[in-house]
Amino acid sequence: MSEERKPLAVVEDRIELAASPEVLWTCFADLSKWPAWFPALVEAKWTSGSPWAIGAQFRQTLKFGFPLGRLTATAVIVEISPSPYVAWEWKVAGMEAIHGYRFDAAVGGTDVLSRHEFYGFPAFLARVFFLTRRMHRIYQAALQGFKAYVETGTIQLRMPM
């Protein structure tokens, strides 16, 4: 994640899953399956570069509901490591975001960290108007959906309010 500047809003969640980091990374790395477990995600597809390589790009369309609406952005992979850890950034409508996921081995499975940093005036407004709480619920639902997808093969597509 970014250490040079301070984000105006941060949303961070963790969840433990009963699978190895390698199994989770294999499931997570299939970008075409993201809409199956991430309720706010409409579409995600690679647009350039080798998947999961620095500089590779993918387009994602998210629906956040009122007042955030629908957002389409091109994400660029900015960091990846074998732990596994991956981070990407996107810029749209005056806001920049850096999203990262880390998969750490734990007793009985893996601890998954989801961290989202937001920069720019829209991020400030989101914090002022308590929209980060809504974003927290959205990303928490994504982790719960990922857990259900990995552990039981079921899909949870309920958008949190």
Regions found by a protein language model. Name each.
Residues 5, 35, 61-113, 117-122, ...:
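Hydrophobic-ligand binding "helix-grip"
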Residues 118-161:
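A conserved amphipathic terminal alpha-helix motif
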Residues 1-49, 53, 161:
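Hydrophobic ligand-binding cavity/cleft-lining segments
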Residues 52-60:
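Short coil-to-beta transition motif at edge beta-strands of beta-rich domains
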